[in-house]
Amino acid sequence: MYKLICKDGNAKRGEFTTVHGKIQTPVFMNVGTAAAIKGAVSTMDLQEIGTQVELSNTYHLHVRPGDEVVKKLGGLHKFMVWDKPILTDSGGFQVFSLAGLRKIKEEGVYFNSHIDGKKIFMGPEESMRIQSNLASTIAMAFDECPPHPATREYMEDSVARTTRWLLRCKNEMNRLNTLEDTINKHQMLFGINQGGTYTDIRVEHAKRISELDLDGYALGGLAVGESHSEMYRIIEETVPYLPEAKPTYLMGVGTPANILEAVERGVDFFDCVYPARNGRHGHAYTNHGKMNLLNAKYELDDRPIEEGCGCPVCKNYSRGYIRHLLKAKEMLGLRFLVTHNLYFYNKMMEEIREAIENQNFASYKKKKLEGFAAEQGN
């Protein structure tokens, strides 16, 4: 259940109660595709850096180790030793990104595994069953992820199919939550709004799915090639047609600046691979933009990544040492950067929540964006 605590303009400060605890929103979910954060960051580390929600991938876990294996081992929470909320995506994005390897039918999608080429079928019911086996806190509906750009005709057909699939997801989720051997009988379902950059299609779809009284709603199919200004326009024009009394989730977005802009437009939930991916490439997020620790100027630098940062890495290690680890191709260097970056995102969300409560989000956002723009020679 979602409780709106307060608003500052369109920015919402809320609390989402789940069977695995309360989520303070706006929130950034830390992406652990195969039930682990890439970069050797454990769930113990996630607890220490203030992670509220972990996100795992249905498609990847279905292919390996298999959702039945995870179920036999007690579900994702027990499997990865994490007692806070977990959101699983539906697998749709991954399936539809296998463009040459898949075939869309009304019942679902036929595709080949990226691991061994084995033929797999996934439709709304299959996605719900897999996510039920994983026993995540929040399951995402199985939707078609249309290509960008797409013709209006294609988009209308695709969105209509996504709506039909959503109804099937809801019915199957309701059924699964009543079964005796279901691990999480309180699994929640979020629907996904699609429509590309066609505002009228997005708005009509938002109105339609809002009638279904789901636990939350996501904006899908963004950050797939459209400009940032187009993405912000779509968020601004679509969010008012989604229920304010439910959380809104912007899937796969994004940079710290993207998050600030989306919060201002009423978004509650975010996820993105950037903090971990950039960390694995030697980049650290700071309040003054991204820093490339591979840069030679940090060789003799005994300062932390960011002065005043409360993460366990900045409290203990220097830029010079981290640079050495990266140059020596030591896994520890990547782990340090991923840990710092996730902490940076989690801390920023904490500051955003505080700014909304104090009714000064606009000035907080302005100051933050000015800091990011000051990135020079990092």
Curated annotation (Swiss-Prot):
The entry's free-text remark on the cofactor is: Binds 1 zinc ion per subunit.
Reactions catalysed according to its record: 7-aminomethyl-7-carbaguanine + guanosine(34) in tRNA = 7-aminomethyl-7-carbaguanosine(34) in tRNA + guanine
Q: Name one GO molecular function term.
A: tRNA-guanosine(34) queuine transglycosylase activity
Q: Recite the UniProt keywords alphabetically.
A: Glycosyltransferase, Metal-binding, Queuosine biosynthesis, Transferase, tRNA processing, Zinc
**Which cofactors, if any, are listed as required?**
Zn(2+)
Q: What cellular component terms from Gene Ontology apply here?
A: cytosol
Which segments carry the region annotation RNA binding?
A: 252-258, 276-280
Query: Which residues bind Zn(2+) per the record?
Result: C309, C311, C314, H340
EC annotation? 2.4.2.29
Gene Ontology biological process: queuosine biosynthetic process; tRNA wobble guanine modification; tRNA-guanine transglycosylation
InterPro entries linked = ArchSynthase1/Queuine_TRR, TGT, TGT-like_sf, tRNA_ribo_trans-like
Cite the active-site annotation.
D89 (proton acceptor), D271 (nucleophile)
> So where does substrate get bound?
D89, S90, G91, G92, F93, D143, Q194, G221
Q: In which pathway does it act?
A: tRNA modification; tRNA-queuosine biosynthesis
Q: Which Gene3D superfamilies match?
A: Queuine tRNA-ribosyltransferase-like
Q: How does it assemble?
A: Homodimer. Within each dimer, one monomer is responsible for RNA recognition and catalysis, while the other monomer binds to the replacement base PreQ1.
Q: Which family does it belong to?
A: Belongs to the queuine tRNA-ribosyltransferase family.
Read off the PANTHER family from this record.
QUEUINE TRNA-RIBOSYLTRANSFERASE
What is the stated purpose of this protein?
A: Catalyzes the base-exchange of a guanine (G) residue with the queuine precursor 7-aminomethyl-7-deazaguanine (PreQ1) at position 34 (anticodon wobble position) in tRNAs with GU(N) anticodons (tRNA-Asp, -Asn, -His and -Tyr). Catalysis occurs through a double-displacement mechanism. The nucleophile active site attacks the C1' of nucleotide 34 to detach the guanine base from the RNA, forming a covalent enzyme-RNA intermediate. The proton acceptor active site deprotonates the incoming PreQ1, allowing a nucleophilic attack on the C1' of the ribose to form the product.
* Protein name (Swiss-Prot/TrEMBL): Queuine tRNA-ribosyltransferase
Q: What species is given as this protein's source?
A: Lachnoclostridium phytofermentans (strain ATCC 700394 / DSM 18823 / ISDg)
